[in-house]
Amino acid sequence: MKHDMTISWDRHLKNGNVWGVEVELSMQETPGDFYTYTVKVYVVAPTQALAQYIVATMYPDYEGIFVDDEPTRTAP
């Protein structure tokens, strides 16, 4: 199948459709020892709410999700 159009990462950035999202995930090395580490994820989505939903779906065992207030305009 031949596609009619390609939307590049740069175009998504220019249009304000890339959101930075920090995800706190728990890690357990031994019983009773809990650690949290943070992962920064960049998501293509038209809204902040959809970006949060996508990340919550990708990381269902998250401890916390923090979406940037504004879309990312430059490449990470």
Residue ranges and their predicted role:
Residues 13-15, 45-49:
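A short, structured loop/turn motif at beta-sheet edges
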